[in-house]
């Protein structure tokens, strides 16, 4: 019988090289109360960072966002099936959020360190960092930030993501060499990552978009039809708000083009793991899909009709 909590070699072979080190600090005992407490702590800090990153002030919108992220199907599935790793996954979420917070403070090296830690804990949460960065750049453009400045920020963020990924890869290779362990190419394995020799990249890009849209409209939840309908309403409102803001709020054509590109890249960015893994993705890996609600809240914040604005969260929830 495979016991995940103590089979450290298996974790190393999956590339989750920092999980065994974290367990040494936390202890190998699977105590639900301890794991639950740590998970809530990490998750709460991540939410607070997100709220501060995007300067959210409206209490209703904050409650709306936090509630939807807290009941994310990934969170529910994690603690229903993999509670022994729940705090590890939430720490990966926190590291992804901290990387973006560090980037916002112009600490690129520190941001890269957190990207490295995130990948070494659970690679799937990398797309949370990607999604938050895309949303930050969209917010900057809506706030009237200069096109060149935002574009330069984008290049710096790519450098941070690549730097953290390279550092993770080098550390992983070193640890695997020392422990004489090879990367697995089985379930959740990394051995084939980056090998697209037998894959149609255009087709994979289309499938990456299709997968996330399917998960939004047909989520794997209780009352899937109701939740899918609510998500469809939020998506339609988000597109409507985006088009209105693109036309009325952004003055520079170059900024409009960049904002549109970021908006179109957003679904791909928060599902980048699907593309990298060539379709190997499941519910425990899709927390980032909930960033749709953050995008909705951000656009709602800029909506000029303030009298209608306060009723939109109720309409979306209904």
What is each of the regions a protein language model found here?
Residues 129-162:
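Perimembrane helix-loop-helix junctions
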Residues 96-110, 140-145:
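Membrane-interface transmembrane helices that cradle and orient dolichyl/undecaprenyl
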Residues 9-33, 37, 41:
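Short hydrophobic/aromatic helix or loop-helix immediately within or flanking a transmembrane segment
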Residues 108-109, 231-236, 301-318:
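Signature aromatic-anchored transmembrane alpha helix within multi-pass, membrane-resident enzymes
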Residues 48, 213, 218-257:
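Hydrophobic, aromatic-rich transmembrane alpha-helices
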Residues 108-123, 128, 134:
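Membrane-interface alpha helices of multi-pass inner-membrane proteins
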